[in-house]
Amino acid sequence: MRDPLTDCPYNKVYKNLKEFSQNGENFCKQVTSVLQQRANLEISYAKGLQKLASKLSKALQNTRKSCVSSAWAWASEGMKSTADLHQKLGKAIELEAIKPTYQVLNVQEKKRKSLDNEVEKTANLVISNWNQQIKAKKKLMVSTKKHEALFQLVESSKQSMTEKEKRKLLNKLTKSTEKLEKEDENYYQKNMAGYSTRLKWENTLENCYQSILELEKERIQLLCNNLNQYSQHISLFGQTLTTCHTQIHCAISKIDIEKDIQAVMEETAILSTENKSEFLLTDYFEEDPNSAMDKERRKSLLKPKLLRLQRDIEKASKDKEGLERMLKTYSSTSSFSDAKSQKDTAALMDENNLKLDLLEANSYKLSSMLAELEQRPQPSHPCSNSIFRWREKEHTHSYVKISRPFLMKRLENIVSKASSGGQSNPGSSTPAPGAAQLSSRLCKALYSFQARQDDELNLEKGDIVIIHEKKEGGWWFGSLNGKKGHFPAAYVEELPSNAGNTATKA
């Protein structure tokens, strides 16, 4: 059985971050263990030094007072003071560093377990839905095959049966038809539910990813605070620990917590590689060219299924238009909505776009089969190269790979496109200051990019694009082969300025 989660980029990114976080937690525990040993040594040394100071004091009590004995008395007091310093240092390390660190680590461990359970729960829903779809499909295929055999029996025996036998067979055929329609609807609904469970899992991964990043920031802040407190206590030792403290202070003075946090963000950043999610498509008995069903029969059964998809496509398209209008209103009227409303609407837009893509892929597949049966030219659709099949025993399964940027970038793009939807064509607008200089800059496509909107450019790996404007939200505007449009900045690499000058002169 094919695993729908194995090759998911979301899953890989989340697991990489978990591994990174686990390494950071192990380091934090090792540092805390070292501090505990240091505290034990300080307390043990303080006790030993206190005993020596007491012995020296007793010896001085039985000694005649003199300049020498007075000097040794100061030495005894010095031992006591030093012992007190070591005692305070050991206790301070325990109370201000070790105890808070273990408390934070325990809370973080519970939080990680909760996040892992949440991810596992939603992942199981995806796998369960995937298996339910295949099970429902197999059941539908068997029922369709039996129904078709019964249908053929009725058709072939009409002339040789009595009216009573005909009624009996027709009643049986009617019940079979009702059962088949019920199983067909059940299969269709499970297929439609597949995208929502997948979205829930991806959103859970996204949220858990952000939560673990926050735990990493907290851990880095904790380690920095421990170092600062450690530095303050060491400073109290005075001249005897100056050399050691100087070395530590130099190292601590170089700490830039913002830089550390930025390093974590960069090291665990989501790569801008194209994310393609796999979704099962509906497969029907009527599509099997090797079935015993005749051509006209197959066409008559495929058309209602195609009409159902077209109705859903029309509804999803209207929903899309409504959501686009809402986003434009939010963008143009800042007092009308808050950031949460805009984000929620963008999420609904993303969900609707995914549903529309899946419906169109199913519709294209059935339309292609119907065109083949009616000997018409094959329809064209951008998803034609994204539909794949694999065979399992006597069944063939179809699935589509839909390009989907990662959630944060995806929602930013939706809001950005909605806010710019009412503006004039970028190609005909007045260039801003510096635009003439920028237009001579070039970039090279690192990955292929399939445009999903009319104002986007199709990119192939190695294409050289002229940059006209660098927009916010990770999208640039440029031209390729005379066509202007937007393209994702993460898919290209900007060439040196001399490359742009050379291209301009040419």
From Swiss-Prot:
Domain SH3: 438-497
Annotated keywords: Cell membrane, Coiled coil, Cytoplasm, Cytoplasmic vesicle, Cytoskeleton, Endocytosis, Membrane, Nucleus, Phosphoprotein, SH3 domain
Keyword rRNA processing attributed: no
Origin superkingdom: Eukaryota
Molecular function, one GO term: DNA binding
Residue intervals of the F-BAR domain: 1-260
Phosphoserine PTM sites in chain numbering: 114, 479
REM-1 domain sequence ranges: 292-372
Coiled coil: 160-222
Matches recorded under Pfam families: FCH, SH3_9
Quaternary structure, from the entry: Homotrimer. Interacts with DAB2. Interacts with NOS3, DNM2, WASL and CAV1. Interacts (via SH3 domain) with DNM2; this interaction allows the recruitment of NOS3 to dynamin-positive structures.
Domains: entry comment: The SH3 domain mediates interaction with NOS3, DNM2 and WASL. The F-BAR domain is necessary for membrane targeting.
Function: Multivalent adapter protein which may decrease NOS3 activity by inducing its translocation away from the plasma membrane.
UniProt-recorded name of the protein: Nostrin
